[in-house]
């Protein structure tokens, strides 16, 4: 997809701090980190999200990359979180499948903020 920023990063058309790459995926530091370690794992082929007929081999490559990133950054020893937002209501802002790998601090117990009584 020619206007997709993650496609451009995967194709080395725009600069990024790449921390892992293989034939199927690229992993790079998030430009707006939400934790001391915040890496995005992205397939090189464009898929809108995790339910976009993604081949099992690509998902396996993504999970493998998560493990490599966790090990290489040391968050495999302290704990980390993996998130794949799917759709606008879930907070997906770039519609190219990606996994967030977050760690390097105490991320707390909850996955999302508790709803307020007004919600």
PLM feature spans:
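HIT superfamily nucleotide-processing domains
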Residues: 1-119
């Amino acid at each position: 997809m020619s206007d997709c920023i993650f496609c451009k990063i995967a194709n080395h058309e725009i600069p990024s701090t790449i921390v892992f790459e293989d034939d199927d995926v690229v992993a790079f530091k998030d430009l707006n980190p939400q934790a001391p370690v915040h890496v995005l794992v992205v397939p090189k082929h464009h898929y809108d999200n995790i339910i976009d007929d993604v081949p099992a081999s690509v998902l396996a490559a993504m999970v493998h990359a998560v493990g490599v990133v966790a090990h290489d950054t040391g968050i495999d020893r302290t704990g980390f979180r993996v998130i794949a937002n799917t759709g606008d209501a879930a907070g997906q802002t770039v519609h190219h499948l990606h996994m967030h790998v977050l760690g390097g601090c105490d991320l707390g117990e909850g996955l999302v903020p508790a709803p307020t009584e007004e919600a």
